[in-house]
Amino acid sequence: MHIDVTGRGPDLVLIHGWALQGGVFAPLVQRLADQFTLHLVDLPGHGHSREDTTPLRLPFVVGAIAAATPPAVWCGWSLGGLFALHAAATLPKVRGLAMIAATPRFVRGEDWPHAVEPAVFEQFGRELATDFGGTLERFLALDVMGSAHAREELRTLRQRLVERGAPTERALLEGLRLLESTDLRGALPTLGKPSLWIAGQRDRLVSPVAMQAAAALAPGAQALTIAHGGHAPFLGHADEVAAALQHFVAALSPADGGQ
């Protein structure tokens, strides 16, 4: 699995969302590389890991990332949040958890109302086989919908989607299955790690209400909602997201991974 390493300081692992790659975090790299050693993951089937056939399943991917990185704070965006949360719940070397536009469960249920219908991800899966490019374009449009900087963010996501090669259909389908079926809420009450939950106020995929509900399940969690932010708030509101990550890590005890 390809992992770019840049910067200096405490270690921070960054895991991207569905269909993208580690380069999507460029705005955060620009702001954090002087203070953190950043480990930018390309998930299997994505970016420079396009030929990596590791199954896109939580234990396989988390194990591979953990084997290639030192003790660190793990930060996941969207789908990447599932890997980061699983790591924080199972690995002592994870010193803290940051979730950006990510929750332990992405689909709606009777006891989890503030999420998307399962049919949303099912439809993306069906359409991939008949209209690969159009399906990805529709998903990117959903990523930025509602954001105050939607046009600029959409241009950036389109560029990041193709600059390292398109993701594989296999990896995309496996990612959709994770989004449809994963429920990690049970791990939160006993997480035992500091956590930060960063939501976009206008996110159409992951409701800030759901993120606040998830944070409430984790003892001592911090929750932040970025005003006017969409599903990728680190693009249009990079200063705010970077500052939140800086403050979060700085507040950790040395044992947790603070400076």
Swiss-Prot record:
The keyword Hydrolase applies. GO terms for biological process: biotin biosynthetic process. InterPro entries: AB_hydrolase_1 (IPR000073), AB_hydrolase_fold (IPR029058), BioH (IPR010076), Carboxylesterase_BioH (IPR050228). Keywords: Biotin biosynthesis, Cytoplasm, Hydrolase, Serine esterase. Pathway: Cofactor biosynthesis; biotin biosynthesis. Its main location: cytoplasm. The keyword Cytoplasm applies. It catalyses: 6-carboxyhexanoyl-[ACP] methyl ester + H2O = 6-carboxyhexanoyl-[ACP] + methanol + H(+). This is Pimeloyl-[acyl-carrier protein] methyl ester esterase. It comes from Stenotrophomonas maltophilia (strain K279a).
